[in-house]
């Protein structure tokens, strides 16, 4: 059961549309879906909103500490409300996944992501859920920092937005703790193919109109 949805990014208008802020885009979209307003919460060093689903409090959080101090925000809220690491989902940009795809993962290393690195440190564990939104890789390691801090091309942004829309459908399953169902929704990168037109018996292959 997910009780805390965290989106990673950097605060400020100059970073708003950059690849590194894909996690913020996801939380913004979820807040719109759930008709919530993210408001500054100084105690948790971020923008936050709380709702009630099935009698359970669920939080949305966007740390405003800059990426490499994200754990300060996540840790503060999680500790105060006694939210366990396994009840946290962190949504972040992922270099090793192409735009338009997303991957749900539990645990593991921070893989060099500075936001995850600090969350690991503040929670004292890597045993929390991550939703990895693909932003693609520049192809050269030396270009990674420049890549994540730039805006994606129009078609890349559209692909990322498509992934956000699709993965938001998994939110109810994530809250309910139905992780297999959530994984199926998130990892289905394309809608199912439409069924072929129905044919009337013996019509010689012409699609039926009724």
UniProtKB/Swiss-Prot annotation:
It catalyses: an N-acyl-L-alpha-aminoacyl-tRNA + H2O = an N-acyl-L-amino acid + a tRNA + H(+). It comes from the Bacteria. GO terms for cellular component: cytoplasm. It is found in: Cytoplasm. Transmembrane segments: none annotated. Residues 186-210 are annotated as: Disordered. One of its GO terms (biological process) is rescue of stalled ribosome. TRNA binds at residues 15, 66, 68, 114. Keywords: Cytoplasm, Hydrolase, RNA-binding, tRNA-binding. The keyword tRNA-binding applies. The record marks 10 as: Discriminates between blocked and unblocked aminoacyl-tRNA. The active site is at 20 (proton acceptor). The record marks 93 as: Stabilizes the basic form of H active site to accept a proton. Its EC number is 3.1.1.29. Its main location: cytoplasm. Monomer. PANTHER family: PEPTIDYL-TRNA HYDROLASE. Hydrolyzes ribosome-free peptidyl-tRNAs (with 1 or more amino acids incorporated), which drop off the ribosome during protein synthesis, or as a result of ribosome stalling. This is Peptidyl-tRNA hydrolase. It comes from Variovorax paradoxus (strain S110).
């Amino acid at each position: 059961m997910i009780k805390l949805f965290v989106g990673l990014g950097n605060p400020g208008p100059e970073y708003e549309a950059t690849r590194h802020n894909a996690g913020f885009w996801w939380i913004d979209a979820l807040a719109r879906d759930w008709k919530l307003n993210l408001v500054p919460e100084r105690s948790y060093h971020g923008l936050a909103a709380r709702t009630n689903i099935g009698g359970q409090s669920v939080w949305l959080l966007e740390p405003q500490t800059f990426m490499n101090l994200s754990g300060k925000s996540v840790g503060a809220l999680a500790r105060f409300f006694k939210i366990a690491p396994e009840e946290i989902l962190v949504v972040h940009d992922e270099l090793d996944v192409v735009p338009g795809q997303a991957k749900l993962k539990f645990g593991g290393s921070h893989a060099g992501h500075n936001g995850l690195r600090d969350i690991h440190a503040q929670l004292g564990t890597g045993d929390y859920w991550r939703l990895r939104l693909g932003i693609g890789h520049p192809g050269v390691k030396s270009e990674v920092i420049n890549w994540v801090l730039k805006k994606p091309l129009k078609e890349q942004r559209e692909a990322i937005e498509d992934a956000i829309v699709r993965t938001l459908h998994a939110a109810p399953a994530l809250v309910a703790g139905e992780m297999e169902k959530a994984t199926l929704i998130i990892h289905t990168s394309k809608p199912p193919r439409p069924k072929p037109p129905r044919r009337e018996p013996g019509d010689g292959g012409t699609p039926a109109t009724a």
